[in-house]
Amino acid sequence: MSKRKQILVTNDDGYESEGLLALVEALKPLGDVTVVAPTTEKSACGHSLTLTRPLRFVEVSEHFYKLDDGTPTDCIFLSLTKLFANEKKPDIVISGINIGANMGEDITYSGTASAAMEAVLQGIPGIAVSQVYMNSGASIREFGYELAQQSIIKLVQKIFEGSYPLPDRKFLNVNIPPIPAAECKGFKSTRLGNKHYGFHAEVHYNPRGLEYYWIGLPRLEWMETAGHTTDFEAVKEDYISITPVQLDMTSHSDIHNLEEWLNK
């Protein structure tokens, strides 16, 4: 009799996030699910690893832990080195369901994507999944996570029944359009798009007159680009975007030009 698959789950919205709980519910029929998630929201923490303070696992329920003040990367790193230290490693790591998009340059900030990145660094298949929303989350309140759940079930089943579609040190970045499941046109392989973030920070003053800042993001502007369909274009057209992301950020096409420039 074959052993049940081992699935490790995390996120960057915190252990109480409805997106995380929806993901866990979808994955339970597919294998044994272990959850290790941050205690609080860690959005935009990137691939941050905590090196200056101690971290502690807190058991919330069976096979469900919060990592006290840890980042998503901490969650994966410590899970693989401690919780799974004497056992078979997870068959897959899934990060999400993030509340909000992680498209284009978002992934350089994203704790959700970075958890999948840490998984593939450790030699384990990784998927980051994010639910795009509209109108301050109204689309999630209306449609829930049904499409995201259906999508991740299909992807994980396909991987478990066949193989992971990418070579080492590459992960899948999945973005779910903000539509009812019945209106989705299917999956589309994409590349990362480009966006203009702009600059925005609110200045305030405390009762002592000292200034402090809140970093905010204005309305994001997607940049139209030629070539293969981008993630934001696919989502805009009601497709589920799946982007293969590699950790090697070398601009290989520029190496020769750089050598020529150095030798001038």
From Swiss-Prot:
Task: Name the enzyme group at the top EC level.
Answer: hydrolase
Cofactor annotation comment: Binds 1 divalent metal cation per subunit.
| Top-rank taxon, per record | Bacteria
What is the reaction catalyzed? a ribonucleoside 5'-phosphate + H2O = a ribonucleoside + phosphate
Give residues annotated as binding a divalent metal cation: 12-13, 43, 98
An example of a Gene Ontology cellular component annotation for this protein is:
cytoplasm
Say if the entry is tagged with keyword tRNA processing: no
> A GO molecular-function term, please?
3'-nucleotidase activity
**EC annotation?**
3.1.3.5
* Cofactor(s) annotated in UniProt: a divalent metal cation
Alphabetized UniProt keyword annotations = Cytoplasm, Hydrolase, Metal-binding, Nucleotide-binding
List where in the cell it is found.
Cytoplasm
The entry's family comment says:
Belongs to the SurE nucleotidase family.
Q: What does this protein do?
A: Nucleotidase that shows phosphatase activity on nucleoside 5'-monophosphates.
HAMAP family attached to this UniProt entry:
SurE
Protein name stated in the entry: 5'-nucleotidase SurE
> What is the organism of origin for this protein?
Sulfurovum sp. (strain NBC37-1)
Gene this chain is encoded by = surE
